[in-house]
């Protein structure tokens, strides 16, 4: 019942934390933690049994019910009507009496029809960003296309949408190989290989091993889960340099930090910059319900944070979540929010940017290069969205930051 309710409310995560009176249960809805303990109450006497029951749902065979003093990581499926929801299970030992905190991440699967798959148009990119991103994807037959951001920023979903745009553009089958840890979005038309750890280290199926093998499997597109180090970057560059499109992620806060991190790898700057075609950095922000939101008055903290120009932009135009009574009475929204949308910044690598970055390395120098090429940050675009009443300024500050 709890899992079905979380799916109905479009929760991305379920958190179950053992407390004195039982589990404290929270759903993450539109990026915000919502306490649902009263709706899904598990008393202290049931904590151990409920924990074991959830661990037994694991289909991956990685979870040990008896292992309570170490983290567990597994997965299983929830079937809800015609939709399958892939659920990632994580347990973490807490306290000293063998209790475990449970986190369940809900990943709805697109299904088998193309019409239900996530597209670039449905992610929430503003029209001018969408046109620019589509253009660079369409005109480049090889190269590296990267998405950056923290966990939960929608990087994997965006990469899949980018690849589907390429597939729709060429209008012919392409050999797409995905290397994932773990597979989060199942695709009928992709060759999807999951990184596996074995008791015998020699039998570990690492991302690097899969990537090297993939290059011998006649790929058109390679979706590589994450570039973590110089080795990953080198193999990814080799793949793009030999006539492939390579899509991957980098854990970095924004485009400037992504470039800085890549340039710090022990690899050829010239080769790296020649292969890079696109970097997108993004966050997912909660969108206000247009029916029950209300005007927002700037706080003193917010006034100190904004520049005079930003103050002039947003003064009298901001909105915030409605009152508790209004939200409860509203038939249109979910806890005051209508959903989540992406705020993105991007860098398209042209000759001017490549030449400039070849001789620059510091954070400030990279920022200067981008600003000279009409770069607009997530913060700047977020201010526009707040000014239009689509998102709360507080949401922008806490999710994107300035």
Stretch-by-stretch model annotation:
Residues 14, 87, 136-137, 181, ...:
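Residue-level signature of catalytic and energy-coupling elements of molecular machines
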Residues 1-4, 48, 52-56, 131-135, ...:
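Solvent-exposed alpha-helical segments within well-ordered globular domains of core cellular machineries
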Residues 143-147, 160-286:
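Switch/coupling sub-region of P-loop NTPases
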Residues 20-22, 33, 83-84, 92-96, ...:
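Conserved nucleotide-binding/hydrolysis micro-motifs of P-loop NTPases
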Residues 1-153, 157-158, 383-402:
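N-terminal "pre-motor" subdomain/linker immediately upstream of P-loop NTPase catalytic cores
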Residues 5, 9, 53-64, 92-94, ...:
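Conserved, well-folded catalytic cores of nucleic-acid-processing
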Residues 252-351:
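Cys/His-rich Zn2+-binding cysteine-cluster or related metal-binding knuckle/ribbon modules and their
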């Amino acid at each position: 019942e709890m899992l079905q309710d979380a799916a109905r409310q479009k929760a991305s995560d379920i958190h179950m934390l053992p407390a004195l009176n039982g589990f404290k249960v929270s759903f993450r809805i539109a990026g915000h933690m919502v306490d649902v303990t009263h709706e899904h109450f598990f008393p202290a006497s049931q904590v151990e049994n409920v924990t074991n029951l959830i661990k037994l749902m694991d289909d991956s065979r990685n979870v040990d019910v008896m292992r309570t003093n170490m983290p567990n990581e597994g997965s299983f499926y929830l079937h809800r009507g015609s939709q399958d929801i892939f659920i990632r299970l994580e347990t973490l030992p807490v306290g000293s009496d063998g209790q475990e905190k449970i986190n369940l991440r809900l990943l709805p699967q697109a299904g088998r029809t193309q019409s239900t798959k996530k597209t670039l148009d449905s992610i929430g990119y503003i029209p001018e960003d969408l046109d620019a991103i589509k253009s660079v994807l369409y005109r480049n037959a090889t190269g590296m296309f990267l998405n950056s951001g923290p966990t939960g920023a929608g990087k994997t979903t965006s990469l899949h949408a980018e690849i589907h745009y390429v597939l729709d553009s060429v209008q012919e089958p392409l050999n797409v190989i995905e290397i994932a840890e773990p597979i989060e979005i199942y695709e009928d038309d992709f060759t999807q290989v999951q990184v596996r750890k074995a008791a015998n280290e020699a039998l570990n199926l690492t991302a690097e091993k899969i990537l090297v093998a993939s290059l011998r499997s006649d790929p058109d597109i390679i979706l590589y889960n994450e570039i973590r180090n110089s080795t990953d970057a080198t193999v990814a560059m080799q793949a793009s340099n030999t006539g492939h499109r390579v899509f991957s992620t980098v854990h970095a806060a924004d485009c400037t930090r992504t470039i800085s991190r890549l340039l710090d790898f022990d690899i050829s700057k010239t080769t790296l910059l020649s292969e890079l075609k696109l970097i997108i950095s993004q966050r997912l922000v909660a969108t206000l319900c247009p029916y029950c939101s209300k005007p927002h008055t700037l706080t003193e903290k917010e006034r100190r944070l904004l520049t005079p120009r930003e103050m002039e932009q947003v003064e009298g135009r901001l909105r915030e979540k409605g009152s508790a009574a209004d939200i409860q009475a509203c038939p249109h929204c979910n806890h005051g929010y209508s959903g989540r949308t992406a705020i993105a910044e991007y860098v398209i690598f042209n000759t001017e940017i490549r030449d400039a970055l070849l001789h620059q390395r510091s954070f400030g120098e990279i920022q200067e290069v981008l600003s000279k090429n009409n770069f607009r940050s997530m913060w700047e675009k977020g201010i526009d969205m707040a000014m239009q009443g689509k998102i709360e300024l507080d949401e922008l500050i806490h999710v994107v930051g300035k």
